[in-house]
Curated annotation (Swiss-Prot):
Gene Ontology biological process terms, A to Z: L-histidine biosynthetic process
Pathways involved: Amino-acid biosynthesis; L-histidine biosynthesis; L-histidine from 5-phospho-alpha-D-ribose 1-diphosphate: step 5/9
Reactions accelerated catalytically: 5-[(5-phospho-1-deoxy-D-ribulos-1-ylimino)methylamino]-1-(5-phospho-beta-D-ribosyl)imidazole-4-carboxamide + L-glutamine = D-erythro-1-(imidazol-4-yl)glycerol 3-phosphate + 5-amino-1-(5-phospho-beta-D-ribosyl)imidazole-4-carboxamide + L-glutamate + H(+); L-glutamine + H2O = L-glutamate + NH4(+)
Annotated protein name in UniProt: Imidazole glycerol phosphate synthase subunit HisH
Organism field: Streptomyces avermitilis (strain ATCC 31267 / DSM 46492 / JCM 5070 / NBRC 14893 / NCIMB 12804 / NRRL 8165 / MA-4680)
Length: 215
């Protein structure tokens, strides 16, 4: 009997994400996928995907109630891969401000999630991104590849500098809707996208395949 060589990915189910869409996309990319909030399963998986839709404050509340904040922190402390999508990326920053109300995020990266600075909000539809050289997340993708966005809030400024030359600075990918905003981050074991790779056709499939390939 042959043992499966597929990487095990948990889609963390805390009530605020397109978990079924993510499950199908990851399975098509070759992963063994489970949707769960079970602590041990989430901790032991090769990769943990944290989706997110809706309000920053509601997502943070749901994540904490499911102990997801602790799971993410412990996985990253051990160098275990985590990927956030949409609001699942936003909550990795210091804070979010919605309608003047500030909510603390997971504080993995400095920065504030605020309203998009654009004439048309939400930003809904397909857009290109500007990925940095050396990106593993966007490997094999053309510069004109388009990804699907749907959001009203974003991070417009990146302020994390790495003073230690022995440490690799995070790779930040940008997109523009009115004003440039952070579209993706690659930071050691922690990767995240503002767009929805599971809804981004062939480009999104390649991106998820790239992530799974690093697990």
């Amino acid at each position: 009997m042959e043992l499966s060589t597929a990487k095990k990915v948990v889609v963390f189910d805390y009530g605020f994400g397109n978990v079924r869409s993510a499950e199908r996309a990851l399975a098509r990319a070759g992963a063994e996928v489970e949707i769960t909030r079970d602590f041990d399963t989430a901790m032991n998986a090769d990769g943990l995907l944290v989706p997110g839709v809706g309000a920053f404050a509601a997502c943070m509340k749901g994540l904490k109630e499911a102990r997801g904040d602790w799971i993410v922190g412990r996985r990253l402390a051990g160098g275990r891969p985590v990927m956030g999508i949409c609001v699942g990326m936003q909550i990795l920053f210091e804070r979010g401000i919605e309608h003047g109300v500030e909510t603390e995020g997971l504080d993995e990266w400095p920065g504030t999630v605020g309203p998009l600075e654009a004439e048309i909000v939400p930003h809904m539809g397909w857009n290109t991104v500007e990925a940095p050289g050396g990106s593993q997340l966007f490997a094999g993708l053309d510069a004109d590849a388009r990804f699907y966005f749907v959001h009203s809030y974003a991070v417009h400024d990146w302020s994390l500098d790495v003073a230690n030359p022995a440490m690799r600075a995070p790779l930040v990918t940008w997109s523009t809707h009115g004003k440039p905003f952070v579209a993706a981050v690659e930071n050691g074991a922690l990767w995240a996208t503002q767009f929805h790779p599971e809804k981004s056709g062939d480009a999104g499939a390649q991106l998820l395949n790239n992530w799974i390939g690093t697990l």
